């Protein structure tokens, strides 16, 4: 400890507004030639380095679907029941798929009314286009197919078996290794909209639909799993019940789990990562852990088995950890320190929080982050959860921190432990606010990626990896920051 009256030599912490990237000679002739692909974790690759934050006002299934279609990924928040979070995972997986593992099924003895209810299933926008008719929901032996058009002139009491197209007249396949191109060719030559894939006993295994093939072939940027489904992540905590949550999420189809607590450099987080990596129910997916702010934390989580790191203690727009607990590290320095350790082990890093502009994304990635996690910038979009409110004559949506008062009270109420002690004991490290309604998410992502492409080009690079090797920073004064924005005009 320093002697009384003297100050120790303190390290300096920098954030995004303290620096700029120095422009360098560029061989890039077009921004379109810049490669923005990266890794989220050891085994998950993305087309763009943007991750939707696991906040209940930012990322549920709608946000996650758009994120994956645009080349990124969404992390589903955990401030809901296990069943609700798993249902969101399944919705993302069904939104765009080559092989549908659980097609909607119905029995031959069902009525028209029951069939209509199944066709209008709420798990997919607009319902489903057809139902697979099976003899039994357990054995799943295919009997036929029922479409909406089959019901057009049917009476209310008509049975499915009298309305369906029998299996003898259907195009089916037993080739469970069929490729996307092969399926498209079968549909073209046989003029069919659906191909059920059957097992040796005629049991229904998968379903391929024309609409899903068109979605896949029409979007080359989407991040997909090995079965052609959109990828999605899910957040968990470190409590006893989170072991059950983790196993259920993996079973539902989550591609990655994010152990997400405010102070990730803790025995609770480290022990959770270790447990997930040895549990056969969860160790088949990558595990990301955080949040952290130091090189020591990065090393400890990597030693525990983490496949990715989430960096950021207190930089978020709705986070007040640094004010309440006096703890944190300015974000640019955090990213640099953690990434330096992570790179040695081949573990990707997520820069979580403090991103206000596309330029900040460029700085975070140049500093060593492989991806950035966005909350505020994606809140208020059409896909973001929450109702549209009107404030001062303008449409807004709510954004709130997951360590804030409202989120924790909602959690306590859901867990049926809401009493007077909860109100007295809670020390919030997050706040609630509103953001303007911003419209669809996809155009916002395109603008951010366009800025990143420019930033990579200014660094004289063609890719993220190249940028991280070549990037050079310059510190700037407050006057330099003011000069960086628009000035000396009246904005329109």
Swiss-Prot record:
Residues where K(+) binds: 314, 316, 319, 322
One Pfam family, short name: IMPDH
Binding site for NADP(+): 30-31, 78, 260-262, 313-314, 402, 454-457
Domain of life of the native organism: Eukaryota
Any single biological process term in GO: purine nucleobase metabolic process
CDD domains documented for this protein: CBS_pair_IMPDH, IMPDH
Reaction equation(s) it catalyzes: IMP + NH4(+) + NADP(+) = GMP + NADPH + 2 H(+)
Descriptive protein name: GMP reductase
């Amino acid at each position: 400890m320093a002697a009384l009256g003297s100050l120790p030599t303190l390290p300096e912490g920098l954030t995004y507004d303290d620096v700029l990237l120095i422009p360098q000679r560029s061989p890039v002739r077009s921004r379109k030639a810049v490669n923005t692909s990266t890794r989220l974790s050891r085994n998950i690759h993305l087309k763009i380095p943007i991750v939707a934050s696991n906040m209940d006002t930012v990322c549920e299934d709608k946000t996650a679907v758009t994120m994956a279609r645009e080349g990124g990924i969404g992390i589903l928040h955990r401030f809901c029941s296990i069943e609700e979070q798993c249902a969101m995972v399944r919705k993302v997986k069904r939104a765009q798929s080559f092989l549908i593992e659980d097609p909607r099924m119905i029995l031959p003895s069902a009525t028209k009314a029951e069939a209509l209810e199944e066709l209008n299933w709420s798990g997919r926008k607009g319902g489903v286009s057809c139902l697979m008719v099976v003899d039994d929901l357990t054995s799943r032996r295919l009997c036929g197919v029922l479409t909406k058009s089959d019901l057009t002139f049917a009476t209310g009491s008509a049975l499915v078996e009298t309305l369906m197209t029998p299996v003898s007249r259907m195009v089916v396949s037993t080739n469970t290794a069929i490729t996307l191109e092969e399926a498209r060719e079968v549909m073209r030559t046989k003029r069919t909209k659906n191909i059920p894939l059957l097992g040796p006993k005629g049991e229904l295994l998968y379903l391929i639909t024309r609409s899903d093939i068109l979605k896949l072939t029409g979007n080359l940027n989407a991040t997909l799993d090995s079965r052609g489904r959109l990828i999605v992540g899910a957040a968990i905590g470190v409590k006893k019940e989170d072991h059950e949550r983790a196993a259920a999420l993996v079973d539902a189809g989550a591609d990655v789990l994010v152990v997400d607590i405010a102070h990730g450099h803790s025995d609770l987080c480290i022990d959770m990562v270790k447990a997930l990596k040895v549990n056969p129910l969860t160790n088949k997916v990558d595990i990301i852990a955080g949040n952290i702010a130091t090189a020591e934390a990065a090393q400890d989580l990597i030693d525990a088995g983490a496949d990715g790191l989430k960096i950021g203690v207190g930089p978020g727009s709705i986070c007040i950890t640094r004010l309440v607990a006096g703890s944190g590290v300015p974000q640019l320095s955090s990213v640099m320190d953690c990434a330096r350790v992570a790179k040695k082990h081949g573990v990707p890093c997520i820069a979580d929080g403090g991103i206000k502009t596309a330029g900040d994304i460029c700085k975070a990635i140049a500093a060593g982050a492989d991806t950035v996690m966005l909350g505020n910038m994606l809140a208020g979009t059409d896909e973001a959860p929450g109702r549209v409110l009107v404030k001062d004559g303008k449409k807004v949506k709510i954004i709130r921190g997951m360590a804030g008062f409202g989120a924790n009270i909602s959690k306590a109420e859901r867990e049926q432990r809401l009493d007077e002690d909860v109100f007295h004991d809670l020390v919030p490290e997050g706040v609630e606010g509103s953001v303007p309604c911003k419209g669809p998410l996809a155009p916002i992502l395109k603008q951010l990626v366009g800025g990143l492409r420019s930033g990579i080009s200014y660094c004289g690079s063609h890719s993220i990896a190249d940028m991280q090797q070549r990037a050079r920073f310059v510190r700037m004064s407050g006057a330099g920051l003011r000069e960086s924005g628009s000035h000396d005009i009246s904005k329109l």
